[in-house]
Amino acid sequence: PTFGRKKEDFVFVSGIGCSSRFPYYMNPYGFHSIHGRAPAVATGVKIANPDLSVWVITGDGDGLSIGGNHFMHALRRNMDINILLFNNRIYGLTKGQYSPTSEVGKVTKATPYGSLDIPLNPPSLALGAQATFVARTIDRWQAHLSQMLERSYHHDGGSLIEIYQNCNIFNDGAFEEYTSADKFNNVIELKHGEPMVFAKGTKGIKLDGFTPMVVDMEKHSLDDLLVHDETNLDLAHIVANWTSHPILPEPIGVIYSVDKPTYNSEMVAQVEAAVKQKGAGKVQDLLDSGDTWTVK
């Protein structure tokens, strides 16, 4: 998408991994930073210059393993940064080890008899961390990807876009069912305020209590279906939890979006209030005031 702003207004901060080489491929202003710590670096950038549009580029290994704590707390604080998590369910840069999102039973160089780990669900983790914007898209769905980037850009607060991406070297076909000719039978595109239909209108999603189920539209009407509400946190948890479900379609689109005060705006207000009450102060005056300080 085109945002009508100068290149100098954007900063891209990445960690370590195949996805984190993004700054080299796209030639933006930014940092190829420390393994797992891109959200921390991006936080500093946003606080130092609030006018910048700050984007974090990470992967399922970098962002959810060594960087899981930074990922979680950046979203919890509602820092006004945009996190793009490229999920290919594998460690690619280190030549094909299983990652936090790899399936149970995944055979890799690190798990020759199959992974025993239960895969982590990025949207569910983000919602649990109280993120204010959570979305998912697919690398091959270019128009949809562009829409999600635009929504994230205009969201005032911390945002996560999980991007399903194929790794044709170490995990080829990871998301083939969502990009093949029959993808519309396997994916549901979430649209705020609209009934949940998929498979070109032939199937829908209905709630049985708290459990979503697939129904045949020849036997049901739109009034029977679950209506997506991206402002409903309870519904967002339900939608996120049917990720990689054996029967339900994979949800893509905006899962959750609400407005809350951002950490960076609250911090600026707090500093301004303190300066107004006590004056700006000088670091040198503090250093020259003696060897001890009284904390009141």
Language-model features, listed with the residues they occupy:
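Metallocofactor- and cofactor-centric catalytic cores in central/energy metabolism, strongly enriched
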Residues: 1-20, 26, 34-36, 49, ...
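Short coil/turn connectors at secondary-structure junctions
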Residues: 6-10, 48-54, 76-82, 86, ...
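ATP/pyrophosphate-binding catalytic subdomain of soluble kinases
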Residues: 132-189
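Glycine-rich beta-alpha junction loops
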Residues: 16-18, 88-90, 141, 164-169, ...
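Active-site-proximal loop->helix
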Residues: 68-75, 93-106, 125
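Conserved thiamine diphosphate
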Residues: 51, 99-154
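Flexible, low-complexity linker and terminal segments
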Residues: 169-296
